[in-house]
Amino acid sequence: MSKIVSINAYEVLDSRGNPTVKVELTTEKAYAEALVPSGASTGSKEALELRDKGTKYEKNWFGGKGVQTAVDNVNEIIFPALKGKDVTKQFEIDKLMIELDGTETKSKLGANAILAVSLAVAKAAANEANVPLYAYLAKLDNRQAYKLPVPMLNVINGGEHASNTIDFQEFMIMPLGAKTFKEAMQIANFVFHTLAKLLKEAGHGTQVGDEGGFAPNLHTHEETLDFLVNAIKKAGYNPATSGDNAVAICLDTASSELYCSESKTYTFKKFKKALDEKRPGFEKYASMKYKFTSDEYVEYYGNLIAKYPIISIEDSHDENDWEGFRKMKKLYGNRVQLVGDDLIVTNPKYIKMAIEKDAINASLIKINQIGSLWETIEAIKMTQAANMVPVISHRSGETEDTFIADLAVAFNTGEIKTGSLSRTDRIAKYNRLLKIEQELGNKAKYEGRASFSNLK
């Protein structure tokens, strides 16, 4: 047993230049630090990220986005409650913080306050045991950590993550034909830089969005997908969902951002705006449909799935459009991974609901959506018990913290979504996974297409 001696929280900046919480935790024998991320496209049921708007700290940072209130809660409420506690009692500590908060969404202390401490506790315990973080996390659930996740690399950004004309939020590639994680990174490297070359040749910019993917002003989703397919081919790989040299495509459409609850329709808002403003090049797409009912949206996805090597779609419908998700699962669930994000917000309560409604076959796991390591692990376990895949995910406002890389390996989740091959806040996670693969040596396993245990 080693007791918690000190916890010090303070404000630092995330990848968007907004404040976030950093915690430094010291025990009798070890030290650790943790930083928490922040999302832009968020589900309404997420645990609350406490910001300073409406408090005495409101003017400290732009838009009242400071987190000094959360920092104070760590230093003045959480630390006194945890001082002297055994750092290896992860779940007991997490439950105590949740009880201290006493609200369903952690709105009193802030999910950002609780999570920062929760992660620091795990890191300190691992450091004290002198074992890698992934090995320590695996032992929390009596597991053996060996599986490197297949990365979903967000190479084109749109939606809330970029100031461009693309409505779907993320266009990703998955190196399914690789034999190791390092080879997956090599494949991604070739495709990413080939895509940059193709975009430049077509007269598009290669500026990047929040998650490091390119953010060109393309006209349609189909045009965007065509660029991806061509980049995969020209890089020397096969745009396919299985087989040798296969590189598949994944989408995060973030459809809650496109939904109107009054009309119950989905609208490609950026596309419509470009048409209304008569932006050059959009006139030839004037007759293209951009507004859909839920059923029409399902059909639209079907056309994309038939034409392109799409293996995964996240948030295909609005977080409250359960019927839309159910229809997607019924029609395409055997051959396409259908991931719930805003639908379930890493919350076991909503994951259970999604399982009962047969709405998805994969859960996106974001540690700050639920706000503690214990609850995150419960979400992963519930997902895997239902033969669904837990996809470990970053947020658009990230930090240099690499906790999620270790988490993916610890629970053999098989998939990770942590941005493109640019921006250090994204690359840090990939570099950590490369290090883990090296440490595991012959024990390391990269499953590629077989990671989709939820598909036939």
Curated annotation (Swiss-Prot):
Comment on bound cofactor: Binds a second Mg(2+) ion via substrate during catalysis.
Pathway participation: Carbohydrate degradation; glycolysis; pyruvate from D-glyceraldehyde 3-phosphate: step 4/5
Enzyme Commission code: 4.2.1.11
Record keywords: Cytoplasm, Glycolysis, Lyase, Magnesium, Metal-binding, Secreted
CDD domains listed in its UniProt record: enolase (cd03313)
The UniProt catalytic activity note for this protein reads:
(2R)-2-phosphoglycerate = phosphoenolpyruvate + H2O
Q: Which residues form the active site?
A: E211, K366
Matching InterPro entries, A to Z?
A: Enolase, Enolase-like_C_sf, Enolase-like_N, Enolase_C, Enolase_N
Cofactor(s) it depends on: Mg(2+)
Q: Name one GO cellular component term.
A: extracellular region
Say which domain of life the source belongs to: Bacteria
Binding residues annotated for (2R)-2-phosphoglycerate, in chain numbering = Q169, K366, R395, S396, K417
Task: Quote the subcellular location field of this record.
Answer: Cytoplasm; Secreted; Cell surface
Sorted alphabetically, which PANTHER family does this protein's record hold? ENOLASE
Family under the similarity heading: Belongs to the enolase family.
Could you tell me what this protein does? Catalyzes the reversible conversion of 2-phosphoglycerate (2-PG) into phosphoenolpyruvate (PEP). It is essential for the degradation of carbohydrates via glycolysis.
Protein name from the UniProt record: Enolase
Q: What is the lineage of its organism?
A: Bacteria, Bacillati, Mycoplasmatota, Mycoplasmoidales, Metamycoplasmataceae
Q: Which gene encodes it?
A: eno
